Each structure stands twice: as structure tokens, then as C-alpha cells.
Amino acid sequence: MEMSSKRKHSSGPISLRSTKHLRSDTAASPQPLTPDDQTLGEEAVYVLDNEDEDLSHVLPLAPAAAAQTDSPEWQATIETVVKSVVSIHFCQTASFDTDLSMSSQATGFVVDAEKGYILTNRHVVCAGPFWGYCIFDNHEECDVRPVYRDPVHDFGILKFDPAAIKYMPVTELKLSPDAAKVGVEIRVVGNDAGEKLSILSGVISRLDRNAPEYGEGYSDFNTNYIQAAAAASGGSSGSPVVNIDGHAIALQAGGRADGAATDYFLPLDRPLRALECIRKGVPVTRGTIQTQWIIKPFDECRRLGLSPEWEAAVRKGSPKETGMLVAEIVLPEGPGDGKLQEGDVLIKVNGELLTQFVKLDAILDSSVGKDVHLLVQRGGEDLEVSCTVGDLHAITPARYVTVAGATFHDLSYQQARLYAIACKGVYVCEAAGSFKLENTFSGWIVDTVDKRPTKNLDEFIEVMKTIPDRARVALSYRHIRDLHTRGTSIVHIDRHWHPHIREAIRNDETGLWDFTNIADPLPAEPPVPRKADFIQLDGANHPAAADIVRSFVRVSCTMPVKLDGYPQARKAGFGLVVDAEAGLVLVSRAIVPFDLCDINVTVADSIIVMAKVIFLHPLQNYTIIQYDPSLVQAPVKTARLSTNYIKQGADTIFVGFNQNFRIVVAKTAVTDITTVAIPPNAAAPRYRALNLDAITVDTGLSSQCSNGVLIGEDGIVQALWLNYLGERTASSHKDVEYHLGLATPSLLPIINQIESGSLPKLRIMDMESYVIQMSQARIMGVSEEWIEKVAIANPARHELFMVRKVDCASPLTEDTHQLEEGDIILTLNDKLITRVSEFDIMYHHETLDALIVRNGQEMRVNIKTVPTEDLETDRALIFCGAVLQKPHHAVRQQISKLHSEVYVSARSRGSPAYQYGLSPTNFITAVNGVKTPDLDSFIKQVNVIPNNTYFRLRAVTFDNVPWVVTMKKNDHYFPMSEYIKDPSAPEGWRSISHDKELLRLDSDNLNADAMDEGRDDGISDMEPDGEK
């Protein structure tokens, strides 16, 4: 258990944690438990696995009893029961309350065949937006929708259309809660471990277990649970627990995650009552005094002060009882606050002795709005109190609001009970967009926005309505795990990528959540010029370092959607001002990877101005951005860039910014200059630097600083120190970040062209090369004459370049490659190539006359260069939660054949793309048998598909394996929209809707933080693992 958790434990032995038996669909892989996870508490562990993964290391497949041959009676019972059991495949399409958006599988069973009701767990029905379907035993499928989810207890009811099941009679299971007794042999029939049907056997061992705690997610309470040994695992949530008569006597809910064959079942008393109310069409009333009770045995009750007289009376009235109900948590400001205390032993309710949760629930549920009278013993003294019963549904959120990319709702009773706090406040259930706070997905309580209190969701909405786009406001908040500490942040309100304040309200008639745009964005206020001064370096021994401070600005970049395989939704670092008069800043492309983003430049730690992308270098890992210099009244200085390449062994001054964004200075020397290529990312291609001379220096600060410069004593910048995004490690699933120097002379032509008023339109050789030494070159067929020429041309490094990989051509264009893997390049336009900088000749030539060595033979080839403006992404389609785009440059660099121009770049949690396994790096080649070679043809085909209808996608994996995806369209939660690059638009891009009826954009609920961009894992927005 985490130290920060406020979970209370009983004085009894510490038990290992329980797990909800959901099974996640294909997307995510199991996460290792920490030692604390494995030894303390009963917190939530969702079983995330692959279809073919061996789960024996998580839970045993079945106890010994399961291996025994069933009797004929049991066989007949099972044959009847399986016809009522369904496999449920579902998504929670948006994060809500205790759960993030997700896709999973579980089990349910029919309890009313005529009206079409299915009983399953509450954590299956979901507190938030639900979308799913069920599969019957004969593999018929039909849609399901929620009609009821209990606010506290772990059960919910789904509805299906019985007429949709045509090839088998729909049968129901009778609910018999009274048949659950110790020693009864049972069978758990369900979707265990993700299988269509599993039958596990066991014997009921306890009826009086307290509800298991699942940690910081949803947990049941104020009910007893039934315990048995059945060893169910992922996917068995909601399975019926049946006796030999074929009656459902309990509902599978959870189990131990430590390998013990122990499962926990919910008694069916309250589900039966809810089902009867729904059948009659009357509300399922639920009452509460906002107090959690737990069962404690008589010996513990005596230590709390239970008198012998009351113990004798209780034992006489209920001879089989072994314990009583004791107050565990009394919520502040609730009906019981000031009247009940933790440790109170409950004796009577409304004058009747009471020791069971079922009777307590019955009284409270029938007394909403009325007073109940409780007799408790506190420290051996009788105490009578009266409490007004509240409506449990009223303190269970049934609406949420999305604004500026984040999702909010009123704090739920679940969360309030978990942390013993008052059930009030604005809860951030998806901390994203403008409200991405301290790298945590959820759990924040917002106290004030723009210095105005937000005590509830309505107050929060009214405050947010008054805040214009791009405003910066103060936010005061606390995390629910640490309410002692109040945080304050300045947030940048985004109402252009996420323009609407959108309210979602649960509709129990339709099972959907209805969306309403309740406020349009206020236009951004015009920026005003501001003054500032730069810091001065105290005690700096190098005047040049003190002066270069005025050439640094901080750059932050936020992206509304994940494109080009880039793994993060926001990134910050430092850039170098290369033209103060024009507001030009050079920054690493690992910070600004593409131009569908918001860029903010902070000057002198004081002035914040917007910036836009001017130029993206296709190979050298830098971006040039521009801000409006008229808004900056500060002595910003243009950095002077050296025209000469720095040499190995040269003395230099390292000036960089550490992880605390503080400037550091050190005198050092250049240790090496090596031609390198950043390693490709195997999981998902993304931009990486190629064919560059990387500079390393002899100082430990270089590993601590991701951005900076190398300067001479005269203050001239000799090299930029940049961060380079590398590969994702297989072990930690984190991204490696390299810190290397880039010499300035190669930057000057680009900067000079931009300063002259024209944008560079570079052309490149569409290939990746690497250095070979003369010993290799000789073996490959390079003549002695050329080896001598290389030694003369480059005395410092005798090397040539061999083609490692030729980029793949588009399937819609003719393959014009003249180079092949293994070619050794001798000259380009008759100039000997022995340095990376000498490849710059390609930037301004449509064709190059190349002399190469191929298969030991010298030959001349005419190489056609590629315009780099065609390599950048200018369009993105959001469809069923998947981000589709033209294959970007990194894909072409790593693959041998492009199968289409419809490439899956990312997908959102809880979406159809996630549910049905359409993975990032897949290519879509056809829709319903019609070829879709590009985005236009794809849009044309999917536009004719009705909502909530299955269609076929023919796809090809990155490893050239074709497969067919069957997917159901969902326009309600995931309408199709598109981002198109448009220089005339204020942000440089515009969004259009393909939702013909509602004209809604998927950007209304788009969340880059909830997207994953990799093939093999569901982890998103990971911070870099380290540097090399």
C-alpha cells in the first residue's frame, strides 16, 4: 500500500490485496507490482493481459476441485446455466470518478429474459459513459445499455433487446440470495481469463466477510461478502455463482491477486430488490447517513466497549451471529457528523436490534428524507441519535464537464468515503489539457480558479465561462491523497483547440450520456508589450557566459493531438535567440516536433508571448520559431554564431540549463566529434536526427543539461547543446533522451535565408547513411586511389559514407530511388564527400550526379532529391478514437513498403479503435472491401457507414502482416473530425467536422494525454528515461 494513502486497516492480520476481475482488451500489457503492492492492502489490480498470455503467474487457472469430474446433476445444471451467461465487451469512453477511460471484458447473466435485463458488476456497468455489447453462448451478439448502477454496491443492470437473439431461446437465472450458506458447493460460470466460457468450482466458506478493498479506485462497502475458493481471474467479473439447482446465489466480484484460490462474491439481496423495482418501473431508492460500517467480531466489539448485557441480548436474538456492525468512517458534514463516531457499536435502528447489513440497507433505502433513530454503544455507554437519511443518488455524480481539455465533476461519495472527507468540491477526473497538474492523471480537487472559489461544479462552470481564450489564471488545488498540501499553479486556458465548455448528463432512459455545449469561448485578449530584465550571473568567471544569458528564452510546447509518433502531449526546454529584431528562436525538435501545437516563449523569466513554427529541419533536430518582438521590452540579444567548425580537443565554455531550469557554466573541452544517427524507435517510428556530427564535451554538466550552448571566450556560439529524442527502452517503457552538441556553421544558411524573408525549401537525399573506415571501404571495393584522396581531403577522420537505408516511396508515387543499401558514396556533383557537412550540397539541387561504389564497381547515378515540405504532416483525421494521417517521414525511413497513405498514428483509451485492436503503426488499405489508398478515399467510404454499425477494415501491420479488423462505428462519443493545415487560420490549422447531424468535433473530447502511440504498449506520455 502506498504511504500516501489514507486507507484504514483493521487490527487483524494484514491481508493481500484483492483484484477486480476485469479483463483489459488487447491494448495494455501487465504492469509489474512493487514490493508494497505485493504485500500490503487490498487495493485494485486490474488484470491486463494479452489473449494468448499465460495467466498462471497471476492466479491459478483452477483449484484442485475444478479438475474433478462433475456429477450428472451438475452437468445438467451447467448446461442450463450457460445459456443465460453472456460475455460483455465494453468501454468507458471517458474518465469518470474512480476510473480512467478504458476498454475491457467481463461477464453477466440474464435475470429477466422477457424484458432483457442482465445482472453484472457495477465496475462493469461503469460510473461514467458506457458503450458495449454482449455475446451469448451461441455467439449471437447484441448491444447493451445501462439501466442502473448502484452508487455503492458492486452491481449494475444492463438491458438488451431479446428480439435480437434469434437462434436460441433466451433463458434467465433465478436469484436466490437465501440459498447462499456455508458449505454449499458452487460453480462460477463466466468469461474467466478472457475466455468465452469457463466453469470454476468451489465451496462457500464464509458469509460474513467485509467487502474487499480495491484501493484508490472503486470499492464496495456497507455490505457483507461471501467468500469461497474458486480461483477466478480476469474477465470473470459479473459471473453468476450458482448452486446445484441452477439458481444464482451470489455475484462474482473480486478475488485475491497473490495466487490464493480465494474469491469474493456479492450477496444478491440488494440486486434482487433493485431488479424488482426496475421491473415495476419505480425508482430504486437508496438512502445513506454517510457512514461506513464494518463487521467486527464480538471480541473486538468488547474491546470497543460493548457491554455484556447487550452482547447477551444480541447473541440471544441472533444465535448464529458472531459479530456486530461498528462505525468505521463518519463523513464530515454528513447526516451522521457530530452524532456518530468511529468505533461506535450499532445496537438498534428504529428500536430493532440490528446486526446485518441487509436490514440496515432496507431501513435506509425506505427512509430517504426521513429520520432514523440509532442506538449505539460508545465506550460502554448507550447513546441514542437521530439522523436524517440522505439520497445516495444525489451525492453520486451523474454529469461531468469538459473544458480546456480536462474533465471535472462534483466529488463523489466513493472518493469522499475513501479519504474520510466531506462530500463536496470540484474533482478533476481527467487532468489533461490546460489542467495537466504535476503529471498525475486524476485526483485533484479545485479550490479556486482565477482567485474565485469553486465550491461545486456549478460555481466552477460560471467561473470558467468568464475566462477568455489564452488567458493565464491562478489555480489553487489539493490532491485527494494529500489534502494538507495546497498547490498553486498558473494555467494557460485553451479555448481554441478545445473551444466549448461541454456538459455531459447521464440519461438512464437511453443509456447514453447527452452532450450540451453550454458556453462558447470568449476571444483572447490582445497581448500588450511588457518590460523585463534578465538575471545576472553572480560570480561568473567568464564574461561571455554572463552575456549569453540574454540570448536564451524558455520554450514550452503543448499539442492537442499526438502526431508523427511523438510520445508526449507537452514539452518544455530552452531555445537560443538567433535574431532578436525578428524574434527568431532556434530550439530542439525534441521540444517542438511539429506545428500542430501551441508554443509559448518566456523571456527573462517574466514575459510570456506566443510563437509559431517557421521552419522544421528534416534531419538536424532543430526547429526555428518566431515570436512578436514588439511585445518584448527587454534587452534580448542576438546570439553570434561561429562560421567555423569547432575542433576536437578545443577549449570551450559550456553554458546550459539543468533540470531546475537554472543556468550552469563550466570551462571544458571538446572530447569527440562523431558522425551519429539517433537509434530508431522500434515500437513506433518518430522523428529522429540523422547524419549529423555530434559533439561531446568533458564535463558532467552535459548529462544534466538538455539545452545550452558551447561558446568561446569572445562570446561567439560555437555549437548548440540540444536534446535528441531516442528510442523507448523495452524494460522500462521510457524514452531515452540524448544530449549532444551541434556545430553552428551548418545553421547559418538556413537562418540567413529566413532573415532575408524567404522560407527555406530544402531538398534531401531520401536515405540514411553511416560512416565506414578505410579498411571496410577497401574490402567493399573502393580503390586505393580514392582511399588516398580521402586521407588528403579529411586528415582528421579518414571515412566515407555507406547507405544504410533508402527511404520508402509513397505507394501513390513512382519509386525514383537510384541508391541502394550498401552503396558507398564517393562524390556528389564531383565533390568528394568525407564529412556530414558536405552533404549540404543536396539542399538546393533537384538532382545530384553521384559517383558510388556498388558491389565492388564504381558507377555514376543520377539521384533525384526530395522536397522536404512534402515530408511534414499537414492533415490528421480523428476516426473512432484513432488518429489517422499520411505516413510521416520516420515511417518511410524505417519501413520497406508503404501499404497505403492511411496510417494509424495514435488511438484514445476507451475508443472503438482501442476496443477492437486497431493499433498504432497499422496501415488501413480498404473499408468494406473497397480500397482506400489515401485519406480522401477513406473518408468517402466511412461517411456512408451508419452509426452503431459494424464495418470491415483491411489493415497491414508495420511488419507487413495483413489482417482484418471488424469495428463498430460510434458517432455519439467519437464523431469524426479532421485537422487541416491552413496558414490563414489563427493557429495555422483548422478543424472541420464530418458529423453531419450534430456538427460536433471529436476535439470536443480529444485528449492527447489519453492516447498511446506505440505498437506494443498502452503507456502514453512517458517522460524521458535519461540521457546518453
Swiss-Prot record:
Its Enzyme Commission number(s) read 3.4.21.-
Q: Name one GO molecular function term.
A: serine-type endopeptidase activity
Composition bias, Basic residues: 1-10
- Region named Serine protease: 85-269
User: Where would I find the PDZ domain in this sequence?
Assistant: 292-377, 878-959
Q: By its UniProt entry, which Gene3D superfamilies does this protein fall under?
A: 2.30.42.10, 2.40.10.120
Positions of the catalytic residues: 123 (charge relay system), 154 (charge relay system), 236 (charge relay system)
What is the annotated localization of this protein?
Nucleus
Name of a matching Pfam family? PDZ_1
What is any one of the record's Gene Ontology cellular component terms? nucleus
Q: Where is the composition biased (Acidic residues)?
A: 1019-1028
Q: Does the keyword Repeat apply?
A: yes
Q: Report if keyword Nucleus is assigned.
A: yes
Location of region: Disordered: 1-39, 1003-1028
Going by the UniProt record, its keywords in alphabetical order are: Apoptosis, Hydrolase, Nucleus, Protease, Repeat, Serine protease
Stored InterPro entries:
PDZ, PDZ-like_dom, PDZ_6, PDZ_sf, Peptidase_S1_PA, Peptidase_S1C
GO annotation, biological process:
apoptotic process; proteolysis
Record's function text: Nuclear serine protease which mediates apoptosis.
Q: What family does this chain come from, according to its entry?
A: Belongs to the peptidase S1C family.
> Could you tell me what this protein is called?
Pro-apoptotic serine protease NMA111
- Per the UniProt entry, what species is this protein from, by scientific name? Ajellomyces capsulatus (strain NAm1 / WU24) (Darling's disease fungus)
